[in-house]
Amino acid sequence: MSALLSADDLNDFISPGIACIKPTVTENRSQEALEYGEVEIQIDENGKPLEISKIDGATKNLSPAQISLADCLACSGCITSAEEILVAQHSHNELIKALKEKKTNNKIFVASISHQARASLATAYDMKVSDIDRLLVDLLVNQMGFTYVVGTGLGRKLSLINELQSIIERKEHGFQGPILSSICPGWVLYAEKTHPHVLLRISDTKSPQQITGCLLKSLTAHQLEVERDQIYHLSIMPCFDKKLESARPEQDPLLVLNDVDCVLTPKELVTLLDECKDKFSLTFDALSHSSGSLTDLYQSCAPANWPYVELSWSSDSGSLSGGYGYNYLQLLQLHLCLRDPQQYQPQNFRLESVAGRNKDIYELRLVYNDNQVASSAIVNGFRNIQNLVRKLKPTSSTTTTKTNPLVARRKARLSSKRSESGAQDVQQADASKCDYVEIMACPNGCINGGGQINLPTDEDQKLWVSKTLTRYGSIPMVDLSSDSSLTLELMAWCREFCINYNVPESRLLKTWFHEVEQPTDQAAILVGSKW
C-alpha cells in the first residue's frame, strides 16, 4: 500500500484479490503472429514473460496486462476499490502530467469542489471555509491555470429534486418497500457485486459529482466554442470510490465521454502541495490581496453562462452527506402543499426523528395531523448496510423459518420483565420499512470519507471530527423546501439546459446499474464472505 492511501484510511476499502479475474482480451493477430503457430508462455531469468513458438522456438516479449477503472467496475474480485488502480489512474501525479501536456494539447481545465472537501481543508489549515475557498480559487486559477472553478451545490440541488420526482413516480406506479439512494459509489459497487437482489430498489438518480461534471463540460464547451473532449474536469471529493464512479460508462451514444476526468481527495491535494512546493501552494498572502466579496469571487471563476453561482457554493440541511433523507421529506411536503393546498397546510406538518441501534442509523417521519405521511432513514457504515440488505433479501414462500429456541426464550424473558415493570416498548428505527433510505458506506457519512485529511498525531479524534462538522455547518444553507419558487425555477432551468445544449435529461440526471457476475476462478473468490 502507498503511504498516501492505506486500508486504515478507507472505511470502505478491501484489499484486491489474489488473482485478478479480468478476462484476457483477445486481439486480432497479424499474419506474422499466426505463423508462430501454437505457443507457450514461460518466464525468463529476469522474471519477464515470454511467448515461445512450438514450431521454431522463436521468442517474443509479452506486454504487461493493463487494468483500468472501467475493468474494476466490471469485476467482482474486489468489492469496491483496488488501490493500485485508483492511484495509477486518478492521482495527483496524473493531474500534474496533464497540466504539463496542456501546452501541446490545448486542454481547457475546469474544476468542481465538494462541500465536505472544503470543510476538511478548512479544518486542516485552521481557517474559515470562505477563506479556504479563496485559497483554492487562487491555487487552481492563478497558479495551475484552470479556466473555471465551481462548487457542487447546483448539481446537488438538481440531484435532490430529481430524487424526489423519481420516488414519487415509482410509488405512484405501485412500488413496494424502500427505495435506496445511489449517491455513494462504495455502496452501489457493493450491491452490484454481492447483492444483486437490491438493484431494483436502488434509485437511478446521479450524484452531484456527475451532474456537475455534465453541466460544467457542456456549458464550458458552448461558451469557449470547443469540443467536450478538449475539456479536462478535476473534481475534489471526500471519497476514493468517487474515482470509480467517474469511470462508470454512460449509455447515451452521443455523449459517451466521461464527465469527470480526474478525482482527487483533500488528502491527495495536500500531498500534491507538499511535493510541488516550488510550484504550487495555498498562498495565505492571497487572502490579504483578495478584497472583493465572495459573490464576486464565485462569479469571476465560473463560466459566464453558469446559473445560480452562489447556489453552487451553498449547502443543504439534513445529514452531512447532502441531506437526501431529510430533503426527500421536506420536498415531499412542499409537493403535497402545492398539489393539493385545500387538503394540506404547511403548519400541520411536523418531522419526527427515531433513533436506531447506533448513531449511524436513524429514521425520519413526516407526520400530518398525527398521521404518518412518509418516512426516510439514514444508514451509514457497512455493518448497518449489511443488516438492511439482509432484511431486504427476498424469502421463498415455500421455506419455513426455524426459530432458535434459545433466542425465543430470551425474547419471552425480556417481554415478561417489561410487562412486570410496566415499561413500554421503545420505538427503534427500521430502515427496511421506510419509503426511502439514504445510504453511505462511511461511518458518519461523506464528511468522514476515506479521502478526508487525517487528524494530526497530537489531536483528539472526537475534537478533530467536531471541528470538521462545525466548518461544514458554517457553509451558508439554501434549503429548497423553504423557497418553492427556487425549486420550480431550477426545474425549469434544467429542462431548458437539456433542450438548448442537446443533452437528454436521462444523460444529465440518470445513471444505471447491473449485476457483476461472480468469478469462476477459485483463486479469485476471497473477499465476499468478509462483508
Task: Provide a role label for each language-model segment.
Residues 2-531:
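Iron-sulfur-associated redox domains of electron-transfer enzymes in respiratory
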